[in-house]
Amino acid sequence: NLYGDIVSDLCAGLVGGLGLTPSANIGKDGAIFEPIHGSAPDIAGQHKINPTACILSASLMLAHLGEAKAAAAIEKAVTDVISEGKTLTQDMGGTASTEEFADAVIAKL
C-alpha cells in the first residue's frame, strides 16, 4: 500500500494536485469512495479546500451504484466549472472559496 500511495500522490501532481483526485477502493463485499488528500486539519474551517476530489468521489460512487447518468452529469459540471476558469479555488490559481466552487458546480447541474 505504501508504494501505491506514493505513486497515486505523484500522479495527482501531474493533473493539478491532491485537491482534484478522487479515489475508489472497491472490494468483493463493499466499496469506499473518498478524496485521496486526507482531512487537511491545518486548513480546516478556512473555506479554501478544493472540493473537486470529494465531488468526483461521489460521482465514482454513483457510477459504481449503477447511476451512470447522474455520475456523468456531476463529472461534466465539475469539468465545465474548471474549464471556464471563473470560479477556481486557490490551488487552481483562483480566489473562490470551497462553497463558491461547490455552488458553481451545483449551478451547472
Model-derived regions, located:
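Glycine-rich phosphate/nucleotide-binding loop
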Residues: N1-K86
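Glycine-rich phosphate/pyrophosphate-binding loop and the adjoining helix
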Residues: A68, A77-L109
